[in-house]
Structures are given as structure tokens and as C-alpha cells.
């Protein structure tokens, strides 16, 4: 079985209903960082019997299982993405668009800072906020 969000749910013995499968599909197909309202709107396009409460419960279940991560970008909305490869976020403060990036030098620097302060780095989050430069 390929490594999909659905397969990881099944590996954790999460009971799979047709509505959960649709919500999971919507998360997997998202190329942005949707909030619950966006997940709901996308899910009801595929199955109009899905309630917003079902989306909230499913998101909570997946988050508690460590399969998705909650992101806060200072706009009052919790957004979600699949848990996976580590990366950082750059948020455009004018459009709200979120760009993912990874920088090995930055990773090394963060670990070095923790080490200099007498810590082993276990986890971290870094969010950058900016405005697109006009040429």
C-alpha cells in the first residue's frame, strides 16, 4: 500500500467511514493550507451529507493521531496540512498566501543555537511574514 494519509489512518486502526474518506481525500488533494470551513466546503462538493461537525471531529481525530498538523498564521484561523517532511512557511501578509520552503543552512543554524544554549533541539516552528517586493 502506498504511503497516503488514508493508508496511515488504516495503519493506526482509525475507523474509516465514507465521509472520513472524503475529508481525507480533500486534505490529501489540498495544495494550500485549508481551515475547517474550506475543508467543509470542498468536502460537501463530493458528498452533500457531510456536516461541518463531522469535519471538525475528523480533523481533531487526525490531529490527535499525529497525521495532520495545525498551523496558526496570526489570522485567527487554524489551518491544516498533512504531517510529513519538515519545512518552514513564509506568509504573504497582503494575500494570505503561504509558501513552504526548506533550507539546510537554516536547519543547521537552529540546531547550533540550541546547542550553544545547552539544549538538544527536539522540535520547532518557524514562520516568516512578508510583503512581496515590487520591482
Show where each model-derived region lies.
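Pre-recognition alpha-helix immediately N-terminal to the DNA-recognition helix
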Residues: 21-26
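Short, Lys/Arg-enriched N-terminal segment that forms or immediately precedes the first helix
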Residues: 1-13
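Short helix-coil-helix linker/hinge
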Residues: 16-18
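Non-DNA-binding regulatory cores of transcription-related proteins
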Residues: 64-135
Amino acid at each position: 500500500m502506498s504511503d497516503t494519509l488514508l493508508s496511515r489512518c488504516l495503519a493506526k486502526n482509525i475507523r474509516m467511514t465514507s465521509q472520513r474518506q472524503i475529508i481525507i481525500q480533500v486534505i490529501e488533494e489540498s495544495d494550500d493550507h485549508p481551515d475547517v470551513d474550506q475543508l467543509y466546503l470542498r468536502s460537501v462538493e463530493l458528498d452533500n451529507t457531510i456536516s461541518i461537525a463531522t469535519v471538525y471531529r475528523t480533523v481533531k481525530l487526525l490531529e490527535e493521531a499525529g497525521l495532520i498538523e495545525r498551523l496558526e498564521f496570526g489570522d485567527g484561523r487554524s489551518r491544516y496540512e498533512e504531517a510529513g517532511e519538515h519545512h518552514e512557511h513564509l506568509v504573504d501578509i497582503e494575500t494570505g498566501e503561504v509558501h513552504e520552503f526548506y533550507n539546510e543552512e537554516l536547519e543547521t543554524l537552529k540546531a547550533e543555537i540550541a546547542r550553544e544554549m545547552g539544549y538538544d533541539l527536539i522540535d520547532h516552528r518557524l514562520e516568516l511574514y512578508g510583503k512581496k517586493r515590487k520591482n
